[in-house]
Structure formats: C-alpha cells, structure tokens
Amino acid sequence: MRRSGPTGGESRIILGNYAGHLSNFGETLTLLDDTARQVARTVLTPLPSDVQLYLAVSEVMYHPAVEGAEFIELINISDVVTLDLTNVRFSAGVEFDFTGSAVTSLAPGARVLVVRDLVAFTAAYGAGLPVAGVFANGSALSNGGERIKIDDASGSTAINFSYLDVEPWPPAADGGGYSIVLKRVATGSDPGQARNWRSSALPGGSPSLSDVIPFGGGDALSYALASAPIVQRAAEQVTFSYQHRLGADEAEITAEWSRDLMAWNSEALVLIGRMPDGLGLETETWQFPAESKGFVRLRVVVAP
C-alpha cells in the first residue's frame, strides 16, 4: 500500500498492460522471476456478480425447421434475486445488448428470449412471449456449432461455452426441428459438457417454458424409461435399443456392459444412434463390443 511503502530501500514498479482480466470468481496470482522461480503469490477473494451467479442459458434453437426462427433462452436460476440486465451483452456467437431492450430485468425463475427474426419467430411460436429483442447486425447462430459468450455489466464473463452439431451433442437439433435443452439448469449444470444437454421433448422446443418432467418419487425406472432394452443382431453387429423420456432430467441413465455379471463398465459400449419420436420419447441404440459375448444393463439413478 502507498501508506506503508515504498520506503527506504524499496521501490515500486508499474508494468502494463496485461492480457485478459482478473476473474470475479477468485484466482491465484503468482509472480515469477526470469528463471521461473516463484517470487510472490496472492489469492484473490471471489466476488462474482449476480449475473455471473444466476444467469444461465437454458435452451438454444440453432437450426430450426422454420428459416429464421432461431432463439436463445436465458433463465434466472435464483429464487430471490432479480437480475439487472442493463449492459449485459452477448460477446460471441451472436450480437445483442440488453441495454434499452424490451427486457432489462429478470425476476427470480423468469425466462427471456433473444431471437434471430421476430417475424419468423412469431409465425412459429405466436405472440406474447418474453422476447427482449433480435440478434444485432445480422448475426445468427451457426448450424455447425459455435461459441456462445455473455458478459456482465462490468465486462466480465458470465457464460461461456461452445455447442456442436455432432455426437455427443443431440443430433436431432441439427435441422431436425428440435432445440437443445440444458438439463438440471437450476443446479448450475455446466453448459460446456455435451452430456448436460438433450433434445427438446417436442419438435420446436419450448421457448419461455420448461419441458422438464418432475420426479414425484417412487420407481426411478418408470420415471426415466418407456421401454426395456431390445437386443438385435444384424450380420456381425449386435445392438440394443431402449426408449427414455425426454425431460426426465432428474434421472441419469447409464448403459453398462459385463462379460461375467460381476465387473460392469460403460466404456465398452458405443452409442450409434438417438432418435426422438416427436411425442416426448427418444430411442437410443448402442453397439455391443465386436466379437464379444456378454451382458448389458441400464442403471438409473435419480439425483438427490
């Protein structure tokens, strides 16, 4: 501090500019000398903004069946905090600034939409939805996947992830009429992990609404699954398929393989297809290991 230094025998060096910026979520700063030896180290206290804590991307329609009907849905996952969206903006993927838009604050649990073309979106979904505005400067979501980044009012990163149009991302969203929906969004699910996304329950998605099926207790298998696995053989390939309920997001379904009914693993099986039926169910097809005899099971765990 200037009040205590520099004093006799001390000096202050000011260098700049440095690349990037300090994280509001806290981090460790380490000073190294020219031999990479640590000279000093300090830990910064986390001071995230409300937008960084509670704003989340909950649904993305990047390749709609109707031209121009793209949208991004955001949600305030807080139960008590209203988010001020002034100066919150998209800085990658599409261009949009909430300042002066039709929606500048977001109540607890509320959702807001940013769309590519308001006319096309209204034709597809109707009027009266909470649309903040349209993507600026002719920007649009890439059909092949891209990075989406949102900054808070201070310019710090609030949301930053990339989606793709190939497995393990939901393939039905690539022109099949479905959106991608972030599972367990209220618990802070990581949007950068493909396994945390699924196809929307119905074609067209559910802008401004949730399509989640709450778990009411009871049998986890009945909650998550709509059919038992079916094993099929074609030439040298053996597969099994099952239907699960899109929106049963509180359940984790894992396909597992064993040669002896003792040791089970999921790495030996290969997911070769996912196909929603347009009525809220999706069929997954998995391939058995080549030239192998063994057993398969589905393990269903409901998150606490």
For every predicted segment, state its role.
Residues 1-193, 200-214:
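Activation on beta-sandwich/Ig-like modules and their edge loops
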Residues 200-304:
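Short, composition-biased motifs enriched in small/polar/acidic residues
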